[in-house]
Amino acid sequence: MKKKTGYSPYPPAIFLMGPTASGKSALALHIARYLPVEIISVDSAQVYRHMNIGTAKPGPEALAATPHHLIDLIDPHEHYSAARFRTDALRTMREIADRGSIPLLAGGTMLYFKTLLEGLSELPSADSDVRAAIEAKARKSGWPAMHQELFRLDSVSAERIKPTDSQRIQRALEVFYLTGKPMSETLRKPKNVSLPYEVVKIALVPGNRQALHQRIACRFEQMLKHGLIDEVRAIRDKFYLSDENPSMRCVGYRQVWMHLENATDALRMREMALAATRQLAKRQLTWLRSMKETREFDCLQENLPEQVKTYLLNTGLKFTEVS
């Protein structure tokens, strides 16, 4: 075993961030070969049980090789929030550090990384009665009308939310109904939060955007071959879901759902899924550019694993290399 000299009073943690199809999961497993890490999934879709193919969850071999956390937490009809992720992640990071291992947080849900680094404003928890009332009103009036109501109550939030984004409209209205204050006002309050870890932030970015798009297309074809359509059909039938459930708004699942509802043919489903995934990757890269003190690596380089290994083992942090 070889120890490196570190100067931070905090235990180390690694953030491995990147757009979809950038190779985060494979790289995380490679890091586990030489550092004593446990992997924490930072993926808002992998929290759902039964959603395996379309979320590219690690398989049995990967799970057996390295401990993974924050996967398969809830059923597809349930809700999961950034606030709950922060609570779950901080608890899990502490447990991993107490075991003498390194928390390696890998994923593409940039909002979750942001909440860990910056904390969350004190928004109220979800209220099932209020949500039910909002949904009932939306069924009668439509979400564009609910967006107009939000504009009247909280114009700042309404300007940031599309009239078709029912999930965010509902949340903004819910916060106003519960607190009597616009959500935008609460979000402006300062957050004094310090993450008690010495974090190494790694960002995987494509040197060639078209090459990433090709990866996205190949991966989606593999998902279809492995039974994504049957997976969505089984989930829909078992849990009596609608397309308003957050789980079914995940990229890929939403487009397959529309196909199963005969709203699109197979070719159009593919086109829509790929377009949505490319847009997701674009948003993820925008988030990454706003991250400070981040070391970028080209995710398309063949020697990426060795580049990252060299970097991690020379950070000066208190890593214990696996012999």
From Swiss-Prot:
Presence of keyword tRNA processing: yes
EC nos: 2.5.1.75
Annotated region described as Interaction with substrate tRNA, given as residue ranges: 43-46, 167-171, 249-254
GO molecular function: ATP binding; tRNA dimethylallyltransferase activity
Site keyed Interaction with substrate tRNA: positions: 109, 131
Family: Belongs to the IPP transferase family.
GO terms of biological process kind: tRNA modification
Residues the record lists as binding substrate: 20-25
Enzyme class: transferase
Protein name (database record): tRNA dimethylallyltransferase
Domain of life of the native organism: Bacteria
Keyword Nucleotide-binding belongs to the record: yes
Cofactor(s) the record lists: Mg(2+)
Catalytic reaction annotation: adenosine(37) in tRNA + dimethylallyl diphosphate = N(6)-dimethylallyladenosine(37) in tRNA + diphosphate
Binding site for ATP: 18-25
InterPro entries, sorted: Dimethylallyltransferase, IPT, P-loop_NTPase
Subunit structure, interactors included: Monomer.
Pfam families according to UniProt: IPPT
Function: Catalyzes the transfer of a dimethylallyl group onto the adenine at position 37 in tRNAs that read codons beginning with uridine, leading to the formation of N6-(dimethylallyl)adenosine (i(6)A).
Keywords: ATP-binding, Magnesium, Nucleotide-binding, Transferase, tRNA processing
NCBIfam families recorded: miaA (TIGR00174)
